[in-house]
Amino acid sequence: MLKNNEILETISMIKEQNLDVRTITLGLSLMDCACEDVKVLSEKIYDKITKTAENLVKTGEDIEKRFGIPIINKRISVTPISIVAASCNCNSYLDIAKAMDKAAKEVGVDFIGGFSALVHKGFTNSDLKLIKSLPESLANTDIVCSSVNIGSTRYGINMDAVKLMGETIKETSLITPDGFGCAKLVVFCNAVEDNPFMAGAFHGVGEAEKVINVGVSGPGVVKKALEEVRGKSFEEVAETIKKTSFKVTRMGQLVAKEASKLMDIPFGIVDLSLAPTPAVGDSVGRVLEEMGLSNCGTHGTTAALALLNDAVKKGGLMASSYVGGLSGAFIPVSEDECMIEQSKNGFLTIEKLEAMTCVCSVGLDMIAIPGKTSASTISGIIADEAAIGMINNKTTAVRIIPVPNKDIGDIVEFGGLLGSAPIMRVSPGNCDDFISRGGRIPAPVHSLKN
């Protein structure tokens, strides 16, 4: 039987602590759309998305009304387009990106992901076409998101892809306002197939025809819970986070199952990730400071983040029948009011953020850098982050934005959930010769598990 204090606690979480479901994401296979004619393929993709997802937004809104749970985004992820379009006789996949954009707008979702390629061991002709299509595709669409997987623990790092993605990010930044196209482009190592979060979501080839995946949020709830155990031992801190994570994830499980039932689409996973927003009271950085840090980014931050990330997973695992996606704590600089502030104050640097990515979900996320940064430096940042993922057998990623005509200390405004970001310093050295070597960095010895 529900107790009054539990009901009041839930209401407080939603009304005062910014508890929400960050996204309901429909994963959709486009394998049956394959066609040699890119125009026909684009039409098939549009038709399948609009037919399958026609009730996605309404379903989310109905669940919001029924349970009183805010659902911030409704999204779609599709099979990596480099696979779907492999038989096309064309030089660019811009028409496909436009069809995805049009279909997503037609059904009313916030973003659609899957304009993607998996090149961790090498390129197919289709992979190269897609990557070369990225700048113009991101410049000519509004809500299409893209990702490229350039490495894995099993196969090493494709350094040719790392070099190419540095050049692609640089080019994209030059043809989109304030480099905004780069905010819709993620470079992965060890990408997962069931990620509900953008911009890195795609529907993996091992997935079902269609699934419902849900991503939860709630850093504000965790911070409020930690306020009750100030000065207590780390054991109590971990226990508090675990109990809170259970409650947050349980809500995500409820929404996922309900959406699955209403749409008659199988339930996939709940992603346990704590995802911040620029709103005050919805910050992962403030959770870390609540543990006893004067500033997020000071010494001790990596340890605090490791504790948070692990406790969130342990608590959430019991609350859902299927946990997947990225499942950890996100540290997107422009989307977290605390991290924005501490970046301005000099406590958070790219080097410190890189250390933090060793122990949390994903990687260097929504970081703005000077527009004059070279393509090889961007490739070097990608290579460093991919190495962390490869060696530690975890997902890492880079979503970095070179902002034209901006330099260290300037501010760029992206708006909405993407927030704003100070332009951060990159190393003045260069890695041109290193990046130009080409080939693959071999997989680590512990990849040989058979």
From Swiss-Prot:
InterPro entries: UPF0210. NCBIfam families: PRK05313.1. Belongs to the UPF0210 family. Homodimer. This is UPF0210 protein CPF_1748. It comes from Clostridium perfringens (strain ATCC 13124 / DSM 756 / JCM 1290 / NCIMB 6125 / NCTC 8237 / Type A).
